[in-house]
Amino acid sequence: MNFIDERFERLKKEGKKAFIGYVTFGYPTFEETLWFIKLVYSYVDILEIGFPFSDPIADGEIIQKASIKALSEGVKLSHLFESIEKFKKDKPVVLMLYANTVYKRGIDRFFESCKACGVDGVIIPDVSFEESFEFKEVAEKFGIVYIDLVSISSLERAKMIGRQSRGFLYCVSRKGVTGFKGQIDDRIFTFLKELKTVTSTPLAVGFGIKSKEDVQKFKDLADGIVIGSAIITKIDEGKDKLEDFLKEISESLKDK
């Protein structure tokens, strides 16, 4: 059993759903990023760290701006690995980054570095399920969980992926990019119910979840909630606003 599996098992026993919080590495500045990462890590159950990329196709305006700012700070993948070594303790860390970054470092070298610094899982959003096996094979060799994404646009495809998934299955709550300000697509609720019938892998819902009210909508169906853009926004508002938000979301995920 990997560390991500262990975390979900523990949370299930505690009657709690996983709070998966996302931060962009290098944001708001290179000097401040580790401080904010540590703060978010102290409240979440699983930390997702995004490594900035110049063309982040899955990300909305908020995370795109954060990525551009982080890139202007001159962050490197080696900086990320060094930072993870400094704060990683008793909760899983997942990286989200684009395929070009992995290819640039070399697939074997990338996953070897992940293992060395304590990364538990990796999400590569611009790689399709069919193209993911070259990454999965190497990830497994180094004990890293490769996490699949599924979309409401194709339930049967999602079921196929779900049957083979590990760690948790990242369920995209609607079409589009992260941080979208529109309504959550109601089809996601039936989608989650159907997925539960074919996979025992925990289901984590993300994209556009920004409040405790949004969390409540998914609490009975999902095993975890992914929040990213809303956390970036709270970072912009300062430490106190961020910490209040993290506390509120964490409390809302407890079984009451």
Curated annotation (Swiss-Prot):
InterPro entries: Aldolase_TIM, RibuloseP-bd_barrel, Trp_synthase_alpha_AS, Trp_synthase_suA. The keyword Amino-acid biosynthesis applies. The keyword Zinc does not apply. Pfam families: Trp_syntA (PF00290). Disulfide bonds: none annotated. Transmembrane segments: none annotated. It catalyses: (1S,2R)-1-C-(indol-3-yl)glycerol 3-phosphate + L-serine = D-glyceraldehyde 3-phosphate + L-tryptophan + H2O. Keywords: Amino-acid biosynthesis, Aromatic amino acid biosynthesis, Lyase, Tryptophan biosynthesis. GO terms for cellular component: cytosol. The active site is at 48 (proton acceptor), 59 (proton acceptor). GO terms for molecular function: tryptophan synthase activity. Pathway: Amino-acid biosynthesis; L-tryptophan biosynthesis; L-tryptophan from chorismate: step 5/5. Its EC number is 4.2.1.20. The alpha subunit is responsible for the aldol cleavage of indoleglycerol phosphate to indole and glyceraldehyde 3-phosphate. Tetramer of two alpha and two beta chains. Belongs to the TrpA family. HAMAP family: Trp_synth_alpha (MF_00131). This is Tryptophan synthase alpha chain. It comes from Caldicellulosiruptor bescii (strain ATCC BAA-1888 / DSM 6725 / KCTC 15123 / Z-1320) (Anaerocellum thermophilum).
